[in-house]
Every structure is written in structure tokens, then in C-alpha cells.
Amino acid sequence: MDKTISVIGMPMDLGQARRGVDMGPSAIRYAHLIERLSDMGYTVEDLGDIPINREKIKNDEELKNLNSVLAGNEKLAQKVNKVIEEKKFPLVLGGDHSIAIGTLAGTAKHYDNLGVIWYDAHGDLNTLETSPSGNIHGMPLAVSLGIGHESLVNLEGYAPKIKPENVVIIGARSLDEGERKYIKESGMKVYTMHEIDRLGMTKVIEETLDYLSACDGVHLSLDLDGLDPNDAPGVGTPVVGGISYRESHLAMEMLYDAGIITSAEFVEVNPILDHKNKTGKTAVELVESLLGKKLL
């Protein structure tokens, strides 16, 4: 890839209840993201952080912090849209996973058939009716598919952003009942940890590449809780039995070799819950693999 990489920080923590994930972009930068990508030969521009207005935080009676989450994602969508218009590669740093609403709103308008790889322990397919918590970080994939609160679904004036047949979830091991029902009804492609253990990551990525081969762009949305908590402890909703560090690098390396990733976000790094920024460092190392770093 010869595009300029545009790094966008999104210090959003209002899509969930645990403080600290707003420091995720800083933790990833502190692990030398910009320097290490520059050392790989990339032109990197750091566009700073999207401002989050905390003075007007107000819990909607239906969804927690709806207005603030919506306002932040509107700004993010506009920033991502501009980066893509300039023919650059958007790399978004979270922040909780609700930021994917803005990333995809700014990205999908540039593609007729955008594919999405959702690398996550969770489905993030909840709605107000199915969510046990009301936290919007459990809803971004549903919202992007056109399901959920009207104001979120219609961000940037169009919906849906993506189609269920163009989504692959990798690493799922914690799904709510409503999410399981939607997956079965829609036929969405999901690789749970059972499939990853049985098939191996090489086969999973090979099948994913084949499945998304008709897409004209592919967005990677990587939640660090997709990894096992032993490898990525600094996340808000850890689930044991996750994808290993090495399996994750293999996945990123294969995606780079295929040349299909056109945008990416790395989310849910929470340095307050981390150990010596281990998860922030892991995020940087996975970005490097996604963008082509190899031993030889």
C-alpha cells in the first residue's frame, strides 16, 4: 500500500460504562504507533483526536449517552469521509466500539459493496430491545446494518451502510439471545472460537477472503477483546478463551498479503485496566502486521 496513513483518535468512552477507554488513542500512540509506521516507510499524518463534548452529557431515557455518542460519531464520520476523499488510508483509534458507527458512516458512502471484518469477542448486534445494558458499544454493527435507533442508523443521511451478507465476524464467544437470533435469520458469516479452534486461523482467513471477494472495499474493525485476555488484558469486556496473539498476527499478515483492507479501526484499549500498556503495544504490533511488517 502506497497511500498516506491518516491516524484519527476517537477518545470516546460514552458507549459503555467503564472509564479509561477514552485514553485508548493516547495509549496506542504512546506505544510508538506513528514512529513505527514511519520506520516501515509509510507517510503518516496524525490528525489528532476528535473532540468529545462532555459538558452536554445527558442520558437518553432509552440509550445511554445517546446525544453525546451521536455528536461524536458525526464528527468522526466527516473526518473519515475527508480522508478517503483525499485518497488516504483512515486508521481510527478508539475509544469504545460505538465509534464504528461513525467510521462506517464515513467510509461506506465511498463503496458500492463494502465488506466488513468484525474481529471481536462480541457480535455488537444489539438494539434497544435486545440489549441487556443499553450501552451503545454493543450496537454499532446492528446500527450500520440499518437496525436500531433512527438517529444512529441515519447518521450521514443514508442507511444501511452495509449488508449482512458482506460481514464476517471473527472471534465471537459472547452473544446475547437477540444477536444469535439475528445471525441465524440473516445468515451472517460468523466464525466463533469453536470454528477457529477446529479449522485454524489460516483456513478462517482464506474462507473470509473468498467470501468477501466481490466487495469493492473491506473495512477491518478490530476490538482488542477479540484476543484472549492473557494477551490483551486492558479491555472493558474481556472474555476468556479468545484468539491468541500469534493467531491474530497471522490474520493481519494474511489480510495484508491479500491487499483487501481499505480502512481500519482498533478499539477498546483501556489503559486503566491494562498492565504496563501491554494492550496498547499489542494494538500497535497488530497494526504493523496489517500494514505489512514481516520478519524477513
UniProtKB/Swiss-Prot annotation:
GO molecular function list: arginase activity; manganese ion binding
Manganese listed as a keyword: yes
Any one Pfam family match given in the protein's UniProt record, by short name: Arginase
Reactions accelerated catalytically: L-arginine + H2O = urea + L-ornithine
Induction of its expression: Part of the rocDEF operon. Expression is sigma L dependent, induced by arginine, ornithine or proline.
Domain of life per record: Bacteria
Pathway where this protein functions: Nitrogen metabolism; urea cycle; L-ornithine and urea from L-arginine: step 1/1
Binding-site residues for Mn(2+) 1, renumbered to this chain: H97, D120, D124, D223
Cofactor binding remark: Binds 2 manganese ions per subunit.
Binding-site residues, Mn(2+) 2: D120, H122, D223, D225
UniProt-listed GO biological process terms: arginine catabolic process to ornithine; arginine metabolic process; urea cycle
Gene3D superfamilies documented for this protein: Ureohydrolase domain (3.40.800.10)
Binding residues for substrate: H122, G123, D124, L125, N126, S133, G134, N135, D176, T237, E268
Phenotype upon gene inactivation: Cells lacking this gene do not grow on arginine as a sole nitrogen source, but do grow on ornithine or ammonium chloride.
Keywords assigned: Arginine metabolism, Hydrolase, Manganese, Metal-binding
Uppermost EC category: hydrolase
Cofactors: Mn(2+)
Protein function: Involved in the catabolism of arginine.
Protein name as annotated: Arginase
